[in-house]
From Swiss-Prot:
Its main location: membrane. This is UDP-N-acetylglucosamine--N-acetylmuramyl-(pentapeptide) pyrophosphoryl-undecaprenol N-acetylglucosamine transferase. It catalyses: di-trans,octa-cis-undecaprenyl diphospho-N-acetyl-alpha-D-muramoyl-L-alanyl-D-glutamyl-meso-2,6-diaminopimeloyl-D-alanyl-D-alanine + UDP-N-acetyl-alpha-D-glucosamine = di-trans,octa-cis-undecaprenyl diphospho-[N-acetyl-alpha-D-glucosaminyl-(1->4)]-N-acetyl-alpha-D-muramoyl-L-alanyl-D-glutamyl-meso-2,6-diaminopimeloyl-D-alanyl-D-alanine + UDP + H(+). One of its GO terms (molecular function) is UDP-N-acetyl-D-glucosamine:N-acetylmuramoyl-L-alanyl-D-glutamyl-meso-2,6-diaminopimelyl-D-alanyl-D-alanine-diphosphoundecaprenol 4-beta-N-acetylglucosaminlytransferase activity. It is found in: Cell inner membrane.
Length: 360
């Protein structure tokens, strides 16, 4: 039975696409997982796949500090090399992040094919440094290829959890009514500024008959300040796939995972990129979506500025006023999301890994 080693660690953006690929591998394959101690994979992976861990850090800072971190990453490749040989792994797949560098180097030392998946429009530092050592660099967005030299890029899209691909009923706690449903996804980082923009714009929309579901995140000092029968606020929901499928419009950050989930659900979006994202990659992700007519972009601004309020009125106003559906801007955005969506990214990556293992 051939074995796949998956190296993915840290955040949902790295783990969920990797889990989708693991679940898509044929039953004739066995999966092993490489992670870092005390990270999210300790909660998500062991019940499904054998988990092995090594210590690996990032590449922050400059000069001697960065050189020291690079040496530590290289040193981490040795235990991964032993793991690949002991487990007899035929191919290695990684979704980037800290764990990717030792996994890529170990695969090369063991002469195993390795695929690195880059989900963002601007590749991360590890992808830019180590992508040239990979058999393929799989891309979630084609714009990333412009930043990679000496690599073998292949556009596959970014896999999403199966829940996003299955029709689901609208949760019963969503405010009832005939008005358009606006879904706000604050995200796990930098949500306070976005939440304040939304709360400033919400009263006028609610007065016109709009319904709002606001997932404000777990760090929100203003939570509970806005009350209205058509406004439902929660820190988080496990039912995001169903919410996206039933929302008429979403307001979201522009992380690659969120963008892929919006796309496969066909949900029109106002994207507010997180201003402190590394290399401003969320702005590049948002631009990629806007380029195919899938979303509009609003830069984060103070709650008293009119940018988001005006955009929401432009998008929701025609529906709230009962205008001709043919002139509804949300219809055009939904068509754009259909163009952006790659619903079989997990299958494409699974097949790529099998093909490379067969050629090795």
């Amino acid at each position: 039975m051939p074995r796949l080693l998956i190296a993915a660690s840290g955040t949902g953006g790295h783990l969920f696409p990797a889990l989708a690929v693991a679940d898509r591998m044929p039953e004739t394959w066995s999966v092993r997982w490489l992670g870092v101690p005390d990270r999210l994979e300790r909660q998500l992976v062991p019940s499904r796949y054998p988990l092995f861990t090594v210590r690996a850090g990032g590449l922050q800072g400059r000069g001697l500090r960065k050189l020291k971190q690079l040496i530590q990453l290289l040193w981490s490749a040795w235990p991964v090399t032993r793991l690949i040989r002991k487990q007899e792994c035929a191919v290695v797949f990684t979704t980037g992040g800290y764990i990717a560098a030792p996994a890529i180097l170990a695969a090369r030392l063991c002469r195993r094919p390795v695929v690195l998946h880059e989900s963002n429009a601007i590749p991360g530092q590890v992808t830019r440094l180590f992508g040239r050592f990979c058999s393929r660099v799989a891309l979630g967005l084609p714009q990333a290829a412009d930043y990679l030299s000496g690599c073998r890029p292949e556009v596959t899209g970014t896999p999403v959890r199966e829940d996003f691909l299955k029709p689901a009923a609208c949760p019963d706690w969503v405010p009832a009514g005939d008005g358009p449903l606006l879904l706000v996804i604050g995200g796990s980082q930098g949500a306070v500024g976005l939440n304040r923009m939304v709360r400033a714009a919400a009263p006028a929309l609610l007065a016109m008959g709009c319904r709002i579901v606001h997932l404000s995140g777990h760090v929100d000092p203003d939570q509970g300040q806005l009350e209205h029968p058509a406004y439902s606020e929660r820190p988080f929901s496990e039912e995001i796939p169903a919410l996206l499928q039933h929302a008429d419009l979403a307001i979201s950050r522009a992380g690659a995972g969120s963008l892929s989930e919006l796309a496969v659900c066909g949900t029109p979006a106002v994207l507010v990129p997180f201003p402190q994202a590394a290399d401003d990659h969320q702005s590049a992700n948002a631009a990629a979506a806007a380029a195919v007519g899938a979303a509009v972009i609003v830069a984060q601004h103070g709650p008293n500025e009119p940018g988001l309020r005006r955009m929401l009125w432009n998008l929701l106003g025609p529906r709230l006023r009962g205008c001709d559906p043919a002139a509804d801007p949300l219809r055009l955005l939904r068509q754009g999301m259909e163009r952006l969506a790659v619903r079989d990214a997990d299958r494409l990556l699974s097949q790529l890994l099998q093909d490379l293992a067969a050629e090795a």
